[in-house]
Amino acid sequence: MTEVVRDRRRIGVVGADLPRQIVLAAGASPERLFGAWSGAVSPRASELLGAVDAVAGRILDSILAGEHDDLAGLVICNDSQANLRMFYVLRVLAARGEVPIPVQLLDAPRGQGAAKQAFVVAQYTRLVDFCRRVTDADIGVDELRRAGDVEQSVSDALERMRERRAQGRCAGTSALNAYRAAASVAPEAAVEVIDAASTPVGQGDRLFVTGSGHPDSSVYQELERAGATVVAEDHDAGDGGWFAGCSTGESEADVLVGLASLHASRPPSAARGSTAERAGTLRRRVADTGSTAVITLARDLDDAPAWELPAMRNALAELRVPFAARVQISADGALSASRDAVTALQEKDGSRR
Amino acid sequence: MTEDRLAAAAAATRHQKAWFADTVRRAQEGEPIALVNADAPHEVLRAMGIPYVVNQWWASIISAKRLGPTSLEHLAERGLPDFSQQYDAIPLGAQDLPAHQRAWGGLPDPAFAIAERSGDVTQKIFELWGEREGTETFLLSRTGADPVPSSWWEKVPRDWEDAFGADRLDLLQAEIEELIAWLSERTGRSLDRDRLARIMDLGNEQAEWNRRTRDLIAAARPTPVLVNDTMPAVMVPQWHRGTQWAVDTARALHDEVARRIDDGVAVCADEKRRLMWVGRGLWSDLDMYRRFHEEFGAVFVWSMYLAIAADGYPRYGEDAVRALAARFVGFTDQLYVPPWSAEWYVKEALAHGVDGVVHLVADDTPGAGFISEALEAEGIPVLEIRANNADSRSSGSARIPERIEEFLRERVPARD
């Protein structure tokens, strides 16, 4: 068996709660493991995780297959039930030596309040220690500030991309790929990819996508092939991702408190946010982005979006924006579900006219 | 009901009906009542004199009246999923059913719905309760199980700071204080902290009786009680935790079990194989637990309900609110999060001298295979069965009795 050489400059992440600045301060680059919309999940991954979103199973399979063994470490966010289960499983397997990557839980509950903030700051402090340990880097306030600037450059590039998208100069598929680069390659390279994201858009519906996260752009391609343009989304592989730098503060603790404050004010996610907040955010963003239709696509066993449907339907009815939803999407049913949903919207559009 | 039924089990069931009728009456007279998740800090409500109904218990009553499917259909009619976390969702669907379809006459609308944010969906269900006229929702955080030091059952009664970590406790303690303030604002009642401390003491006393009962059963040969009898005898008083009645009932169960042992009572006359049931109770076929007595001399001596009541609840400490946070901050971690789950089941299997384990694998928990693996590593054969414990269609198609028979024949030799 060949010994895998660990790359101290890359730390993997599952989920979307990572304050990337902390990893960057260690001289490493965060590399998000996304999984995929389609593909088999092995019986072993299914057995280990129990009944969860297949995307988590695909990520676990890639880890069990050794595809990420060269990472310096792996941070798993408690931002969904599926990801938390993955942490529990990998913690056991890592302790047994069956998975060679050091694994760390990042548990950052959303929302305001001093107690939550203190808990999140304590989690970030542990994350700093973990990054020091797996990279052998010194992390102090100077490194954190510099990393904050670097992260802000990614955030700024994404803001420029969102402006192009709003102006109809960047299609949803390109935007999603840019977000993917932002989350998984080194910042300088990511900025180049993001700034290059510029594609003509179609004349069909301006679509807002909510529901499950999109681990790859295959569904966006399908939606846009059908004539729509995805102009915005709230899932964490797109606009709901977290790219924010905090370069102020006199001490390490100040910077971590600053990051915790930024985290607390993030928009709500399906798995952790309240339905009322989510529906309110959707209504505001649909209006702001000039979206002409909304689509929810929720995978089987990723149930949180299904509980939001009546509230979202009501919120959109007030705006007179048509809405199509497909839930319990099977492991290989994403493309057909997205085609069905677009067709349903087009039929509604036809009947409106 | 069997001729072997424990008097404590029958008494508990009778008490529950009378208690529910009284709770309904109080609500009808205008008292605010609460609907709570099983892992919410009930003791606060008890200390503030607010009657509460546990969501999961209420779901079991609705299901037992075969109103689960109708309740779920009602959710679907509202555009909500009928396929997601059904057990927790059934009471929400049942709440608007017509009077003739309401179990035990129906649950009065609660003033408060209180839950922790476990999983992705519980908070959504409880949020929907809060949208109903006259009901408000309060949600508590549910942090991940990290750290997980070994032998949790030795640590959690007193060394809970180490067992769960101060950060997790700080957060939940602060949120319980917020809950107390929230309830005070709405009821005009303040929390008597001495009363809460007394309630914690009573809960600990109840757990101590359960521990003694569990230890008696672990050491007894032959086994003196049916597991399907200890389930209600333990679980009904659990929902009354912190009362003298619950302590007295736990003690009565202990004394009854002790008497049976002294009298040489055997639920299986010719006990040759001692079995452990890992997983939730098979509510759809409780008689299954005694089906292997005659042919195989095989008797189920263990289920988690008494054992977790013994090990999972005791929390001693000067600060009652922090001790209460310690009771709930990782309650389900004890049962379902590896490696804690596997370590505990092994400890219990060895203490009870079991010859084989039937593991009803839950698909809503991670790493169930680690439990089977750990038991097999101790030389204890395990039969894994995948089925829904509450759905008779699922358990029927899993051929549970037939597979247990095969397991007994092939892997669990009879004792001499």
Residue ranges and their predicted role:
Chain A
Residues 307-353:
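Peripheral docking tails and interdomain loops at the edges
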Residues 14-36, 210-285:
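Redox- and metal-dependent alpha/beta enzyme cores, enriched for Fe-S-associated oxidoreductases
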Residues 71, 286-296:
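Proline-aspartate-enriched helix->loop->beta-strand connector
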Residues 18-91:
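An N-terminal, globular interaction/scaffold subdomain
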Residues 58-133:
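Acidic/His-rich segments in extracytoplasmic proteins that coordinate ligands and/or metal ions
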Residues 2-9, 121, 125-243, 271:
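A charged, amphipathic alpha-helical module
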Residues 60-63, 273-290, 307-308:
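A short, acidic, amphipathic alpha-helical segment used as a generic capping/interface helix at domain edges
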